[in-house]
Amino acid sequence: MASVRETGVNVSNDGITVVLGSQWGDEGKGKLVDILCDNVDVCARCQGGNNAGHTIVANGVTYDFHILPSGLVNPKCQNLIGSGVVVYLPAFFSELEKLEQKGLKCRDRIFISDRAHLVFDYHQRADALNEAELGKQSIGTTGKGIGPAYSTKATRSGIRVHHLYHWAEFEARYRKNVADLQKRYGAFEYDVEAELIRYKELAQRLKPFVIDAVAFMYEALQSKKRILVEGANALMLDLDFGTYPFVTSSNTTVGGVCTGLGVPPQRIANSIGVVKAYTTRVGAGPFPTEQLNEIGDHLQSVGREVGVTTGRKRRCGWLDLVVVKYSTMINGYTSLNLTKLDILDALDEIKVAVAYIINGKRIETFPADLDSLEEAEIVYETFPGWKVPTTGITHWDQMPENAKKYIEFIEKFVGVPITFIGVGPGRDEMLVKE
């Protein structure tokens, strides 16, 4: 694989490089982050929680990441969990220990913002009770308590990391939140006293990791450190711009980077959108190009489309460029990473959605009104397959002609160059398009 510095999208030392999902998540952001982390000083998470999930294969070892930044794979990289992240401490320590068991030395390279909000078991209980209450109208959350944690944040009853070190306030907030949830959902069994004892211990274990993240990021920028931010989830799961209400509870856009880390927008130098060569989605919600047929089955099985966090099979369908173009409008991508191209290798023909026809009108942007999508006619562009393996390709001139046409069409339609092309699961199976 060509080095990152040969791509034209270097990790700048005069600003922040951001990696964002352009679809419904699971695009393969972690692999690109892992590759780029070879040349960065800081890797940060800005939003979400341990509802995110991705797998990295490095030096023959497989690592699963949920709450921790994937820059931990690079022994020289400092890693930050920013103020916009919601943190479930048992999961934080469990994930840290699993990485250490695989040989990574992490403890002096991972930091948590003192302004980050905490996720508790009562949030997870509320998550499950809310989904059960919704029944068939449930949105299919990960059950990690992320939504309820962001809810208490929005109502100003949330508990932040710094509250752990002011115990009287922590305890008062904790007891009130449990009482409020029991009023809302009815009395449920919950051992508050045992949980308070547990969090007194966790507070002491966490203390070495806690920092002022705003000052950390400011100093990193002033020192011209190379900074990479990995977004969790994806644009179509954004609270404001995604397929609401079938979304996550944080801002997954480039704007979420600024609010989640406390950095000004003008310090973002590069925004890389990660695009899977087809489309997948976990859980309920609109999916215009979903294929409930042999094509969908092929993409699911060959692509091994099973969620890292939930273990659920992902719904699969054709690439939807209406979604990717809409995502580009919001995030202003400077380049794209097309992933899992190899999963299309065996197909006779490949379709790409380029527009929707709704109420007789052709549109090329994603509508806010989800009901209108149910009646939408999807306009496809059809391409002949290339029918040869792309795995093992290391240079653009080795790419099959039909695959080149597919890639070039995406670039032209979206208006953004594709710089990286994934042709296999390994970190070395990433073609750099000059």
From Swiss-Prot:
IMP binds at D26, E27, G28, K29, N51, A52, G53, H54, T142, R156, N233, T248, R312. CDD domains: AdSS. Keywords: Cytoplasm, GTP-binding, Ligase, Magnesium, Metal-binding, Nucleotide-binding, Purine biosynthesis. It is an enzyme of class 6 (ligase). Plays an important role in the de novo pathway and in the salvage pathway of purine nucleotide biosynthesis. Catalyzes the first committed step in the biosynthesis of AMP from IMP. Competitively Inhibited by GMP. Allosterically inhibited by AMP. Homodimer. Mg(2+) binds at D26, G53. Binds 1 Mg(2+) ion per subunit. Pfam families: Adenylsucc_synt. InterPro entries: Adenylosuccin_syn_GTP-bd, Adenylosuccin_syn_Lys_AS, Adenylosuccinate_synth_dom1, Adenylosuccinate_synth_dom2, Adenylosuccinate_synth_dom3, Adenylosuccinate_synthetase, P-loop_NTPase. GO terms for biological process: 'de novo' AMP biosynthetic process; adenosine biosynthetic process; cellular response to cadmium ion; IMP metabolic process; purine nucleotide biosynthetic process. It catalyses: IMP + L-aspartate + GTP = N(6)-(1,2-dicarboxyethyl)-AMP + GDP + phosphate + 2 H(+). The keyword Mitochondrion does not apply. It is found in: Cytoplasm. It comes from Schizosaccharomyces pombe (strain 972 / ATCC 24843) (Fission yeast). GTP binds at residues 25-31, 53-55, 314, 340-342, 422-424. This is Adenylosuccinate synthetase. It comes from the Eukaryota. Its main location: cytoplasm. PANTHER family: ADENYLOSUCCINATE SYNTHETASE (PTHR11846:SF0). Its cofactor is Mg(2+). Belongs to the adenylosuccinate synthetase family. Substrate binds at V308, T309, T310, G311, R312, K313, R314. Its EC number is 6.3.4.4. GO terms for molecular function: adenylosuccinate synthase activity; AMP binding; GMP binding; GTP binding; magnesium ion binding. Pathway: Purine metabolism; AMP biosynthesis via de novo pathway; AMP from IMP: step 1/2.
